[in-house]
Amino acid sequence: MSQTAIEGEYYFRKMEIASGFNFSKDGKFQFFYVYGSVDRNAAGSFTVEGDTLKLKSDKEPGKDFTITNQSKNGSGYTVQFIHPNKYVLKHILCTFVADGKEQQEFTDEDGQVHVDIPHCDTIYALHTLYPDIPTIVKDDKNNNNHFTLELKPSLEQVSFKDIIFKIIDGKTIECINNYFMDATDIKFIKQ
């Protein structure tokens, strides 16, 4: 199947959700998603392999936050997020991995999470309003235990990393696996 077979606009609509793609002849796409107070977007390129549609967003996956400060101070592990809009600070999930075991904690109203654990190999951060590939805050080579991070403007974009789309026919594209939309049975229909 050639790329031109999916050229045009495809939409998914469900109660409170509107989403769509615009695929162009030159292998580029634009995407939007609106759900309640959350708006997301993406742009990039696409390829078609058989009945599989592969998207490559301009957004780099796993880079939703920037570490602005890190240090070794006291005990436990503290991650502080900063952003002018306090509403977005309380929806960040941090995953602390120690010896293969995970502990997940949400940030408080001020964008902070603290865990009293003696050792942590890896820390990941994921914004639950804008889910995408988690950002690595700390790896096993980093001995720091206090981190300050800023939310990047690209947070609202979708990377589409590891997302599989199947071309059902000339008018339907189905999202097989999904981490970025609060919906199931996602089928984009050509308009």
Task: Say what each PLM segment does.
Residues 1-191:
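Lipid interaction determinants
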